[in-house]
């Protein structure tokens, strides 16, 4: 299922691959986020051209719209979307728990209020697994509690215990999955920013021996040094033979940090989100195309990029589209940023294979260390 081809000599970075039901996925792997089964503003053909073999979709959003019954009538998420590569489906736990006042947690699940129409719903670990089984997801993520940075120890302990119990329920459902379903379950470790809780969570999850393992609940607003502390601590406790996934990271410097510590898979909406505000990823840092200096700039955004924007249009034209709030500008910028992320991952793989990852990381971080990805 998972094989490591090369371990970097100077870090825990590694190159490998996952064999999934809809094809091989090379690692390290950046997953584009297609919340509702598609990336905002991008055709599947763009991702296919990039040889993207794994996309993330979200169970919470698909449950609310179009609904499980609709997707079931189509024979699953792949048929519904016509995406013939792999889907990892998130449980929707992060979205549910982001609702704060609109949800209520108990030991068996979570009751929440739809952000669409105000109707009430109840998610259980078993129910969330069953939905993803209907989707035909290639990687299933369990219902968990992603707790906020800054909560006290007692609250973090409670949420960690609930997450572990839900993982056990999900794993039981996975062991009793429908005949013929061959998707993989990646269980999620939690523990907030308390090392003893992290250690206990990881040990409890490892006892279940799921095919893959994820680190949840980091990159949730904490200082970068706390992110790095828990990332390093958690990764060192994880077995090397399992694929590792850090949920919700997608900025270049966070990805480089994760790969350095042996993480194989990551996802984030950030590249597409910042594109909608006119921020473009380049080898020299972020280009904020709305700035006046680009008004009459006839050059391309970046050389050696094969996206539609860089092969046809100028910086000045893109600035005009973004300033005018034209949808076409957002589409061009989004495609560029996704192209950039895939080129970056390709360069990282090459660096690891050549035992040059540390030099690559050091050089790259000089350009991106101080960037503000929220602009």
Swiss-Prot record:
Residues forming the catalytic site: 90 (proton acceptor), 267 (nucleophile)
Pfam families: TGT
Pathway it works in: tRNA modification; tRNA-queuosine biosynthesis
Binding site for substrate: 90-94, 144, 190, 217
Reactions this protein catalyses: 7-aminomethyl-7-carbaguanine + guanosine(34) in tRNA = 7-aminomethyl-7-carbaguanosine(34) in tRNA + guanine
Cofactor or coenzyme needed: Zn(2+)
Enzyme nomenclature, EC number: 2.4.2.29
RNA binding: region residues: 248-254, 272-276
Disulfide links within the chain: none
Example GO biological process: tRNA wobble guanine modification
Keyword tags: Glycosyltransferase, Metal-binding, Queuosine biosynthesis, Transferase, tRNA processing, Zinc
Family: Belongs to the queuine tRNA-ribosyltransferase family.
SUBUNIT field: Homodimer. Within each dimer, one monomer is responsible for RNA recognition and catalysis, while the other monomer binds to the replacement base PreQ1.
Identification of the protein by name: Queuine tRNA-ribosyltransferase
Organism name: Borrelia garinii subsp. bavariensis (strain ATCC BAA-2496 / DSM 23469 / PBi)
């Amino acid at each position: 299922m998972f094989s490591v081809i090369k371990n970097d000599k100077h870090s825990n970075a590694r190159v490998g691959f996952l064999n999934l039901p809809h094809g091989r996925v090379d690692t390290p792997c950046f997953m584009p986020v297609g919340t509702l089964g598609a990336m905002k503003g991008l055709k599947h053909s763009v991702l296919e051209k990039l040889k993207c073999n794994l996309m993330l979709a979200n169970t919470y959003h698909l449950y609310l719209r179009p609904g499980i019954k609709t997707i079931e009538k189509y024979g699953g998420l792949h048929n519904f979307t016509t995406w013939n590569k792999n889907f990892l489906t998130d449980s929707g736990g992060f979205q549910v728990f982001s609702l704060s006042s609109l949800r209520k947690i108990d030991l068996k699940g979570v009751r929440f209020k739809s952000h669409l129409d105000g109707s009430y719903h109840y998610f259980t670990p078993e129910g969330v697994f069953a939905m993803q089984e209907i989707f035909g997801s290639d990687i299933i993520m369990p219902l968990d509690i992603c707790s906020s940075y800054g909560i006290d120890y007692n609250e973090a302990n409670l949420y960690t215990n609930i997450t572990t119990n839900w993982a056990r329920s999900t794993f039981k459902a996975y062991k009793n999955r429908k005949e013929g379903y061959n998707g993989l379950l990646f269980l999620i470790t939690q523990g907030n920013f308390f090392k003893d809780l992290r250690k206990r969570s990881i040990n409890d999850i490892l006892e279940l021996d799921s095919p893959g393992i994820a680190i949840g609940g980091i990159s949730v607003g904490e200082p970068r040094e706390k992110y790095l502390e828990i990332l390093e601590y958690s990764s060192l406790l994880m077995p090397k033979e399992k694929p590792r996934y850090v949920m919700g990271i997608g900025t270049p410097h966070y990805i480089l940090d994760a790969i350095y510590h042996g993480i194989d898979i990551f996802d984030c909406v950030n590249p597409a989100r910042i594109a909608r505000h006119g921020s473009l990823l380049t080898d020299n840092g972020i280009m904020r195309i709305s700035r006046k200096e680009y008004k009459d700039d006839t050059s391309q955004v970046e050389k050696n990029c094969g996206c539609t924007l860089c092969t046809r249009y100028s910086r000045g034209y893109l600035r005009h589209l973004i300033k005018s709030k034209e949808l076409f500008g957002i589409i061009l910028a989004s495609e560029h940023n996704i192209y950039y992320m895939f080129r970056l991952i390709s360069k990282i793989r090459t660096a690891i294979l050549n035992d040059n990852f540390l030099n690559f990381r050091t050089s790259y971080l000089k350009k991106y260390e101080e960037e503000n990805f929220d602009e």
